[in-house]
Amino acid sequence: AYVLYTSGSTGRPKGVGVSHGALWTHLQDFLATFGIDGTDIVLHSSTINFDVALHETLPALLRGATVEMRGAQPWDLQSLSERLVKRRVTFARIPTALWQQWQRHAPPRAQLALRQVTVGGEALPGDALARWREGPLADIRLDNLYGPTETTVAALYRRTGADD
C-alpha cells in the first residue's frame, strides 16, 4: 500500500513497507473503534509524509466524511481553535504537546462541534488528562494512540475514562 521512511530507534533511515491487507485491516478497526461516518468533519493536521496523516484522511474518505485540510502553515493555538470552530470539526487528532497547550486556551465548549480527540506521538501526562476530565471539554472523548511506523500507523489505542 505504501512505503514510509523512518529512522526509528536506530537513527538510520529505513524504508518501511505496509501491505494493502495490513492497512485495510487497520482502517477497519479504526473505523469500528471511532465510529467515523458521513456526518463527521475530520481534521487533517499532519504532513502527508507522516503515517498519522492516514488516520486523518483515509477513514473519513472511506465513510464519506469531510476532511478539513490543514494547509501549508503549521498550527498555532489560535489558528487551531479558529479552524475547529469555523469548520465545525467533529474528529481531531492533535499531537500531545499541542493538545496540552490548546486545552488551556480552547474556545468555549458551546462553540465546538468536537465529539472525539485523539492524541499521540508521546506519552499522555496524567495531570493533563485530569485537567481535561475536570474542565469544560470533559464530554469530548479523548483517546491516546501509539505505534511505530512498522505497525501500520498505531498499534495501541487507549480509550481514556474517568478513572484514568
Predicted segment positions?
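Motif- and composition-driven signal specific to adenylation
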Residues: 1-164
